[in-house]
Each structure stands twice: as C-alpha cells, then as structure tokens.
Swiss-Prot record:
NCBIfam families attached to this UniProt entry: hscB (TIGR00714)
Gene Ontology terms describing biological process: [2Fe-2S] cluster assembly; protein complex oligomerization; protein folding
Domain J: 3-75
UniProt gene name: hscB
UniProt-recorded name of the protein: Co-chaperone protein HscB homolog
Subunit structure: Interacts with HscA and stimulates its ATPase activity.
Length: 174
C-alpha cells in the first residue's frame, strides 16, 4: 500500500512539519535528478523516474489535508477509499449542500459582492471547523467518522473554488 509518510521518513500523523517535509522533498529530488543518471543504464533511469514520480505523488498527498487524512485512514484500515462508490449518508449535510448551492446561485444572479464575501467567509469557517473535527477523529482513531469529514471537506473545497469563479465573474462585469 502506498505510504507517503514512509517515502519522506515521517511519522503517520495528520500534523506535519512543512519545513521538514520540504527539506526532505528537496533532498530526494536532488538525489533522483535525471542528471545523476545520464550515464546509467535505461533500467536505472526508469527506476529513478518512477521513484521521482512517487516522491511527487507523496508530496501532493501530504500537502493536501484531505488526501493526507485519507492516506492515514487507508494505512490504518487497510482499505483504499473509492470515491466513485462513496456517497454521503449524512442527509442533513446533503440538505446543507443544496442550500449553499442555491445561496451561491442567488448571490451570482444578484451580482452582490458583499453577500459573496460573507458567504465565502461562512464556507471558510465551516471548512476550518471540519478540519478541526477531522483532526480530532483521526486522533481518536474514529476512521469512519474521519472519512465522513473528508467527504464534507471535499465538498467545501469544491464550493470554495466555485465561489472564486463567481467572484471572478462578478468582478469582470464591474
């Protein structure tokens, strides 16, 4: 099973020291740089390229809190998360999603910058609250609950991206 923490010789923990992660990334990338393998055979070059790809994938996973949490869950449960088969069972959150989408559509329709800023702040606060709850769930090894928080965070992340697109469209019209 892919273990991004092992690649960087880090403990499996949601809280990371970004400076240590970045330093180890640079060290690994320097060691795997293609110039180091110019005189090597094709197999060694291919292996170095594969390892470099693994390092990049691991970095991407560890820098993204949702992917990092999902990696921790997978490492502890032995199960990879299949996003296509997952569906949110939290009816209240599904209703909240619909309400937020309608709210964003209304803000965009009205071209209301102040309402958009307030909405963006609300979603940012919700995301922060979900990250805190995710951290607590991981700490207490409640893997199913942590997975649910990942789902919710994935939604708020997408919604934040949509808010940014709406913001760009509103400011283009000004």
């Amino acid at each position: 099973m892919f273990n991004p923490f092992q690649i960087f010789d880090l403990p499996v923990d949601f809280q990371l020291d970004e400076k240590v992660l970045n330093a180890r990334y640079l060290k690994l990338q320097k060691a795997l740089h293609p110039d180091n393998f110019v005189s090597s055979n094709a197999l060694d070059q291919r292996v170095a390229m594969q390892k470099s790809t693994e390092v990049n994938d691991a970095l991407k996973t560890l820098k993204d809190p949702i992917l990092r949490a999902e990696a921790i869950i997978a490492l502890n449960t032995g199960e990879q998360l299949d996003l296509e088969q997952k569906s949110t069972q939290d009816v209240a959150f599904l209703m909240q999603q619909l309400q937020w989408r309608e709210q964003l559509e209304e803000v965009e329709r009205q071209q209301d910058e102040r309402a958009l800023n307030a909405f963006a702040k609300e979603i940012k606060q919700e995301t922060q609250s979900l990250l805190t709850a995710l951290f607590e769930s991981l700490k207490s090894q409640q893997w199913a609950r942590a997975s649910q928080y990942c789902d919710k965070l994935r939604f708020t992340h997408k919604l934040s991206e949509e808010i940014e697109r709406v913001e760009e469209r509103i400011f283009e019209l000004d």
